[in-house]
Curated annotation (Swiss-Prot):
InterPro entries: RPE1, SDHF4. Residues 1-24 are annotated as: Disordered. This is UPF0369 protein RC0209. Belongs to the SDHAF4 family. Residues 8-55 form the RPE1 insert domain. It comes from the Bacteria. It comes from Rickettsia conorii (strain ATCC VR-613 / Malish 7). Pfam families: DUF1674.
Amino acid sequence: MDDKKDNRHLSKPAYREECTGDTERSTTAYMDILEDVSTGSTSKLPLEAKFVKISNNISEKENLPKEKEIGGVKGLEPTRYGDWQHKGKVTDF
């Protein structure tokens, strides 16, 4: 690879934060400062990103018991016909 830093992840605005004011003091919490010479904007990258681990294990979800609706319709759901009835009042979707 060449000496240029790989900044493909900065193409989305959600990953980019503009620097304003005195950048010397505001850069202490950031690892890399990237400056786009053509536009003059500066982007900051955080020291570490925190990711939440999402379980993709489907078997855990399948073993959970289904919760029954309290006060719900007995039998088949009326939504399969495109309407809902509650205490004699019908609502169409």
